[in-house]
């Protein structure tokens, strides 16, 4: 309940991921937890958060990975021990299998944004744990359902912020964003000195008038 309340009050994506990891560590007897997120369709799912600051996040899961495809098609978390007997597992590259086996993966869960798989949670087994607890599957499912809604809201907010700061025609940052940055820099340098240089491009306005704003 505390997790649900806290996560619904923030639109900060990193905070949502950190809180999701924290509640899983508190409620389950597991090893390490990793979260991989996809920035854009077609791109790989890259490591962005973990329960340990020193854990290596320099890894990724390709969108074509059969395990990723399984998570896209299913709502429930994946029990890795059972998944090893599936057709999807057998169709994975040996390198992909080795990477997951080396981490002692025990569960994988999807973070959904509607029909899109926005992210993946990898949960590894604790070294002293002898068996899986299937009640944990339901717990993981409940946590990821709440986290998925929060992530969707955070991504929508981030998209709205980017659109508000970007010129629709040129794709460049607009005057509103310029004033935001100017205000931030002024606040950071209130006790010091700050200089602003404006550069004018010769005949730029004329070029826009002749060939159009998009071309300019």
Where are these regions (language model features)?
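A short, aliphatic-rich beta-strand micro-motif
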Residues: 104-112
